[in-house]
């Protein structure tokens, strides 16, 4: 009897599941002009498969449905686009049927005023404020000297002259990126405050790509909780600065006093959301790119040899304590190529999201109002027509022609949403590489696993043995 009852329950579950899946497909298929695809379960869609399978999920659907298909991921019906020209047009069409369409989890955790989400006059004001903080003149006169001093000091402890040391380069670059961001943005040095901020920021990052289910134990719940704590810490920091009247040479002070060259002064809420977004975006991109650059250089000795030569040439005529300057950075052509190739091959950013404000025609299909477009840049990064032999680490490809001006160059986004921190991020990674390759030699230790979806990471760390050069 028990076995019969179990069999009935299982059969009923199968029937109900099949009916739910079928009902969901029929519900969406009534909309005319949709691209082919599947929508998965009601409410959850295909999010679980998307997050678990990642690139395999995308490739399987591309083979079945073509380069434009529909799905339901991260809480919203979505059209995935893998065609370079269609993606370029989508990114360039803000205000003409498209607005930013990031998942609810990211909007909630980074804040409703985060620069990736706001539109219109507020976006112009916040982007203007951010560009004023990271414009070339600021990098040259203020940010680069700070970055240089930080990197020199931070990397000094990675090894000793008497012996080699095994380090987890993933953990090291995460700490480095976060401390560098905190130092530049809010003047926070290593200590109890940075430790408290670090703990919450690590939790916040995990919640940004998740289903917005606010239940204890979920990444979203933990991430949103971490945001509340971060907001409280930043509010206290702002209050203390106002009461002390002391001047601080950092981005937070510039935002509080009003950034030079901007018309509008941001509210405290907007400043806090901008600070959280700055730290989040700088931390994620810089730490991952730095880690993967070390990995790729370790695997490609010829590239490492040319990179070292470039940096030792810069050190010629400098005393050991001399900093690198703007002219040194501008001369790092191969370093820039290594950074761009790392971003491309590792696919640090998998894609960009837009949302339709009206029915939009795309490639003969009609994308309904309120749907998302997932500009899937991973496939563009691996397009053999744009990047011959795309799965090979080849930084020299970036020296052959000005790839940065190519209309399908999307390593830093596109359209009016091109990453405003592109250059300062490149400066940070280049400065890290300068001191790392001129001070150390290294080799990979053990068998390290690298995952590239939904974010690039080494689940058990990426261990290298470091020795003084």
From Swiss-Prot:
EC primary class: oxidoreductase
Positions that bind heme: 419
Enzyme Commission number(s) from the entry: 1.14.14.-
Listed GO CC annotations: membrane
Induction statement: Down-regulated by brassinolide (BL) in the brassinosteroid-deficient dwarf1 (brd1) mutant.
Pfam families linked: p450
One of the record's GO molecular function terms: iron ion binding
Pathway assignment: Plant hormone biosynthesis; brassinosteroid biosynthesis
InterPro entries attached to this UniProt entry: Cyt_P450, Cyt_P450_CS, Cyt_P450_E_grp-I, Cyt_P450_sf
Localization in the cell: Membrane
Distribution of this protein across tissues and organs: Expressed at low levels in all the tissues, but preferentially in the leaf sheath.
Outcome, altering residue 101 to V: In brd1-3; dwarf and defective in brassinosteroid biosynthesis
Highest taxon, organism lineage: Eukaryota
Catalytic activity: 6-deoxoteasterone + reduced [NADPH--hemoprotein reductase] + O2 = 6alpha-hydroxyteasterone + oxidized [NADPH--hemoprotein reductase] + H2O + H(+); 6alpha-hydroxytyphasterol + reduced [NADPH--hemoprotein reductase] + O2 = teasterone + oxidized [NADPH--hemoprotein reductase] + 2 H2O + H(+); 3-dehydro-6-deoxoteasterone + reduced [NADPH--hemoprotein reductase] + O2 = 3-dehydro-6alpha-hydroxyteasterone + oxidized [NADPH--hemoprotein reductase] + H2O + H(+); 3-dehydro-6alpha-hydroxyteasterone + reduced [NADPH--hemoprotein reductase] + O2 = 3-dehydroteasterone + oxidized [NADPH--hemoprotein reductase] + 2 H2O + H(+)
Keyword terms of this UniProt record: Brassinosteroid biosynthesis, Heme, Iron, Lipid biosynthesis, Lipid metabolism, Membrane, Metal-binding, Monooxygenase, Oxidoreductase, Steroid biosynthesis, Transmembrane, Transmembrane helix
Residue intervals passing through the bilayer: 1-21
Gene inactivation effect: Plants show a range of abnormalities in organ development and growth, with deficiency in the elongation of the stem and leaves, skotomorphogenesis, root differentiation and reproductive growth. Treatment with exogenous brassinolide (BL) rescues the abnormal phenotype.
Topological category with respect to the lipid bilayer: Single-pass membrane protein
Family annotation (PROSITE patterns): CYTOCHROME_P450
GO biological process, one term: skotomorphogenesis
Similarity section: Belongs to the cytochrome P450 family.
Its biological purpose: Catalyzes the C6-oxidation step in brassinosteroids biosynthesis. May convert 6-deoxoteasterone (6-deoxoTE) to teasterone (TE), 3-dehydro-6-deoxoteasterone (6-deoxo3DT, 6-deoxo3DHT) to 3-dehydroteasterone (3DT, 3-DHT), and 6-deoxotyphasterol (6-deoxoTY) to typhasterol (TY). Involved in the organization and elongation of the leaf and stem cells. Not able to convert 6-deoxocastasterone (6-deoxoCS) and castasterone (CS) to brassinolide (BL).
Protein name: Cytochrome P450 85A1
Organism: Oryza sativa subsp. japonica
């Amino acid at each position: 009897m028990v076995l019969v009852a179990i069999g009935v329950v299982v059969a009923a579950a199968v029937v109900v599941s099949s009916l739910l899946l079928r009902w969901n497909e029929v519900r969406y298929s009534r909309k005319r002009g949709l691209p082919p695809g599947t929508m998965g379960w009601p409410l959850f869609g295909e999010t679980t498969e998307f997050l678990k399978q990642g690139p395999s999920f995308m490739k399987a659907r591309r083979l079945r449905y073509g380069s434009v298909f529909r799905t339901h991921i991260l809480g919203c019906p979505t059209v995935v686009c893998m065609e370079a020209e269609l993606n370029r047009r989508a990114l360039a069409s803000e205000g003409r049927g498209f607005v930013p369409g990031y998942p609810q989890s990211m909007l909630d955790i980074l804040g409703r005023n985060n620069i990736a989400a706001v539109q219109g006059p507020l976006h112009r004001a916040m982007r203007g404020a951010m560009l004023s903080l990271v414009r070339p003149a600021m990098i040259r006169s203020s940010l680069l000297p700070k970055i240089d001093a930080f990197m020199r000091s931070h990397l000094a402890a990675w090894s000793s002259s008497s012996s080699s040391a095994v380090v987890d380069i993933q953990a090291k670059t995460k700490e480095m990126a976060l401390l560098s961001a905190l130092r530049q943005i809010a003047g926070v040095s290593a200590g109890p405050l940075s430790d408290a901020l670090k703990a919450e920021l690590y939790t916040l990052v995990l919640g940004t790509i998740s289903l917005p289910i606010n239940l204890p134990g979920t990444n979203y719940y933990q991430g949103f909780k971490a945001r509340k704590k971060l907001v409280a810490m930043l509010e206290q920091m702002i209050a203390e600065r106002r009461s002390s009247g002391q001047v601080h040479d950092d981005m937070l002070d510039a935002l509080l006093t009003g950034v030079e060259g901007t018309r509008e002064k941001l509210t405290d809420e907007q400043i806090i959301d901008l600070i959280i977004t700055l730290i989040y975006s700088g931390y994620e991109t810089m730490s991952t790119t730095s880690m993967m650059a070390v990995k790729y250089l370790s695997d490609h000795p010829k590239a490492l040899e040319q990179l070292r030569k470039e940096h030792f040439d810069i050190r010629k005529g400098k005393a050991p304590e001399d900093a690198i300057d703007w002219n040194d950075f501008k001369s790092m052509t191969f370093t820039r190529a290594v950074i761009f190739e790392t971003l491309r091959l590792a696919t640090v950013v998998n894609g960009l999201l837009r949302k339709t404000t009206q029915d939009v025609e795309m490639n003969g299909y009609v994308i309904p109002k309120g749907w998302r477009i997932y500009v899937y840049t991973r496939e563009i990064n691996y397009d053999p027509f744009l990047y011959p032999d795309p799965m090979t680490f080849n930084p020299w490809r970036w020296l052959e022609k000005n790839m940065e001006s190519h209309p399908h160059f999307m390593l830093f986004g596109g359209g009016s949403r091109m990453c405003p921190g592109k250059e300062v991020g490149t400066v940070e990674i280049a400065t890290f590489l300068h001191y790392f390759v001129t001070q150390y030699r290294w080799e990979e230790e053990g068998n390290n696993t690298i995952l590239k979806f939904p974010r690039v990471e080494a689940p058990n760390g990426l261990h290298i043995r470091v020795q003084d050069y």
